[in-house]
Design a protein with these regions (language model features):
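Fe(II)/2-oxoglutarate oxygenase catalytic core
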Residues: 2-260, 264-306
Length: 306
């Protein structure tokens, strides 16, 4: 039987994040509870649930109550013997198939540390993600925080001229763009095909509230119709603006935390931690509803991907 207690939300910062009390995510949720969570996501963008010792099945059940699950492609970067989770999860741990930390020079680890760059999950997909739900099973002794930036608050702090400038702009997103920033450039032909750039609007509007946000990510490598140097400088300026400390919440993980965030109005990044220590965190992702921009498979896009 669904528990009817309404969750309580306690703001963490003036702009972003709330801690949630009065809800046990191991139990099926009533429609009123789901509606309260959706409303809170629109308002706070990041929700923190402490002391939620979920099984994988319970994690999946909670996710499905909020929307359809996006299939993860991360296992394609792992060796078969290192796959720990089904594709309903994104395994964003630093662990191999024996639950041991990857070696410092392991290719999967070097690709994964690109997550230390500010990004929005799945902005490199034609239909980008809506919510992400990350759960901690083990945490390192120090470091490993996840930081979140509120892109709606950042948009509202822009001057009118900048808002007008970016309103019509379309960016191209690819994981190859973000990995290039850290010097990771060795991709197979199959990976280059899979990571072809997709187009996303630079300004998004939340459908239920009408609130606008900067839709930005380290995956964004250029702006359609702009010269590359000018495009990247504008994207850098916007990222520096959006990640000022006033717009950012840094989450220090505890075992059995579940943190969910709205990718449509946030960026996030992981922080460093000792390479020899385990950080077992696993994520489910809720699919978005539609593309933000038309996809044009033209010669220019193909050239950017090469």
């Amino acid at each position: 039987m669904a528990i009817q207690i309404r969750p309580q939300f306690h703001p963490i910062t003036p702009f972003i994040g709330a801690e949630v009390d009065g809800i046990d995510l191991r139990e099926p949720l009533a429609p009123e509870q789901i509606a309260a969570i959706d409303d809170a996501m629109d308002r706070y963008a990041v929700l923190v649930f402490h002391d939620q010792p979920l099984t994988n099945d319970q994690h999946l059940a909670f996710t499905r109550s909020l929307g359809p699950i996006e299939t993860s492609t991360g296992n394609k970067l792992r060796k078969p013997e290192d796959i720990r989770l089904p594709t309903t999860f994104a395994d964003v741990s630093n662990l191999d198939g024996n639950n041991k930390p990857y070696a410092r020079n392991d290719r999967k680890r070097l690709f994964a540390i690109g997550n230390r760059l500010w990004h929005s999950d799945s902005s490199f997909k034609a239909i980008p993600a809506k919510y992400s739900l990350l759960r901690a099973l083990s945490v390192p002794s120090k470091g490993g925080n996840t930081e979140f930036a509120h892109m709606g608050a950042a948009y509202e702090a822009l001057d009118d001229a900048t808002k007008a400038l970016i309103e019509p702009l379309i960016c191209e997103h690819s994981q190859m763009f973000s990995r290039d920033l850290i010097g990771f450039r060795e991709f197979s032909p199959e990976e280059r095909e899979r990571f072809k750039p997709v187009r996303q609007r630079l300004v998004r509007t939340l459908p239920r509230t009408g609130r606008k946000s900067i839709y930005l990510s380290s995956h964004a490598g250029t702006i359609v119709g702009w010269e590359m140097p000018e495009a990247r400088l504008l994207l850098r300026d916007l990222s520096e603006h959006a990640t000022q400390r006033e717009f950012v919440y840094s989450h220090k993980w505890r075992v059995d935390d579940l943190v969910m965030w709205d990718n449509r109005q946030t960026m996030h990044r992981g922080r460093p931690f000792p390479v020899e220590e385990a950080r077992d965190v696993r994520r489910t992702t809720i699919s978005g509803d539609a593309p933000t921009a038309a996809q044009v498979d033209d010669a220019r896009t193909q050239a950017v991907a090469a």
